[in-house]
């Protein structure tokens, strides 16, 4: 198990870092927020032009043919710059499963436009009242060669702007269907929601929505397997983004405390401050190690259910502690919503809760351990 990045990966990350550093500046983010926006379409177009948006998609749909490892490294940089682009939501959670499980027609219909930055896709993985996204309450009833979907999905990123929404639903015989839903289809109602980070989301109500056979990504025979595949990658994608957020929040704290003086000395020299940041450093490195381990196993096609849950647990618990430590050592500046650290705090809180907070991950780890032979 080797976590060392190669030259190609370093070059990819370097390119992404350069673009994000130049375009996702605190000033630019403040301008977007002041204008009532969040998604930076111009930045996303630039990332697409550089081959970053489609890096993990297959070459025959305009992608770079790279793997989950490279995508996780890119997501870390998105988190480090709190960049308002849909790399996690569109590429990892929606385009990647279409690339993996879709027919030639399904793949060619939308993925070239995703790689080129011309289309947004999203996935509806969250439901109110259901802690486990692997067992959706939304139902899929057979209708000829297709299905009819009924249910309510919550916190769907970019729901109103997406070309297609990937929707998991349960059949009457405990099967799972992954369907591609047009947000403008009859029976679809989208109510605006706003995430902690400011990201536009939506509550998506499906009222007997017809899904033709050509829009069924995975049928009941392989649906549960495909949903597990998707959620494992979505969770490590969240963990990778959280790693970037926490790592940059820690770096900002180190810079601030070495420059801020009190009683004639930098406050970083005070034992209480140093210990707080040292604990945060340990949390960040634990987040890094567990995330890379889970990504490596998934990329190698090996079982990783426990490792994925451990990585997300560290993203939740470690990310929570780092966010609060960073805010604490910044003092009054740390709670100023106009100070850049505020975005890192809000992103951290959102990522902590995305697809299951720490207790949900512990439950999954415990369930796995309970079913393993002694």
Residue ranges and their predicted role:
Residues 99-102, 141, 167-170, 180-183, ...:
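Short beta-strand-to-turn element immediately C-terminal to the catalytic PLP-Schiff-base lysine
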Residues 135, 155-156, 182-218:
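Flexible, small-/acidic-enriched active-site or ligand-binding loops
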Residues 117-128:
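A short, Trp-centered hydrophobic/proline-enriched beta-strand micro-motif
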Residues 110-112, 128-129, 137-139, 153-157, ...:
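A generic local secondary-structure boundary/capping motif
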Residues 66-67, 132-135, 158-162:
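Short glycine/proline-enriched turns and hinge-like loops at secondary-structure junctions
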Residues 85-105:
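N-terminal glycine-rich flavin-associated loop
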Residues 1-81, 101-104, 117, 142, ...:
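Alpha-helical interface subdomain recognition
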Residues 124, 150-189:
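A short core secondary-structure module
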């Amino acid at each position: 198990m080797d976590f060392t990045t190669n030259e190609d990966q370093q070059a990819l990350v370097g390119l992404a870092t350069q673009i994000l550093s130049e375009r996702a500046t605190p000033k630019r983010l403040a301008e977007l927020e002041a204008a009532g926006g969040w998604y930076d379409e111009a930045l996303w177009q630039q990332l697409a032009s550089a081959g970053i948006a489609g890096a993990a998609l297959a070459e025959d749909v305009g992608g770079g043919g790279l793997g989950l490892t490279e995508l996780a490294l890119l997501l870390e940089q998105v988190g480090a710059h709190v960049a308002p682009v849909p790399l996690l939501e569109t590429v990892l959670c929606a385009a990647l499963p279409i690339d993996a499980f879709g027919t030639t027609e399904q793949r060619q219909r939308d993925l070239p436009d995703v790689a080129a930055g011309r289309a947004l896709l999203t996935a509806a993985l969250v439901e109110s009242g259901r802690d486990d996204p692997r067992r959706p309450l939304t139902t899929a009833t057979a209708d000829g060669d297709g299905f009819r979907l009924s249910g309510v999905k919550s916190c769907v990123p970019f729901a109103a702007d997406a070309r297609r929404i990937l929707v998991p639903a349960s059949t009457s015989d405990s099967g799972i269907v992954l369907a591609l839903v047009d947000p403008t289809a009859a029976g679809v109602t989208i109510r605006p929601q706003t995430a902690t980070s400011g990201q536009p989301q939506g509550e998506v109500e499906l009222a007997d929505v017809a899904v033709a056979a050509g829009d069924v990504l995975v049928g009941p025979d392989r649906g549960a397997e495909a949903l597990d595949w998707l959620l494992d990658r979505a969770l490590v994608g969240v963990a990778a983004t959280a790693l970037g957020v926490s790592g940059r929040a820690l770096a900002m704290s180190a810079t601030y405390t070495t420059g801020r003086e009190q009683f004639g000395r930098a406050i970083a020299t005070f034992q209480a401050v140093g210990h707080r940041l040292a604990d945060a450093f340990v949390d960040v490195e634990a987040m890094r190690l567990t995330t890379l381990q889970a990504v490596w196993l998934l990329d190698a096609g090996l079982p990783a259910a426990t490792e994925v849950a451990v990585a997300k647990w560290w993203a939740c618990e470690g990310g929570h502690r780092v966010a609060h430590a960073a805010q604490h050592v910044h003092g009054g500046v740390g709670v100023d919503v106009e100070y850049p650290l505020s975005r890192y705090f809000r992103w951290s809180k959102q990522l902590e809760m995305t697809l299951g907070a720490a207790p949900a991950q512990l439950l999954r780890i415990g369930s796995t351990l309970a079913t393993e032979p002694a």
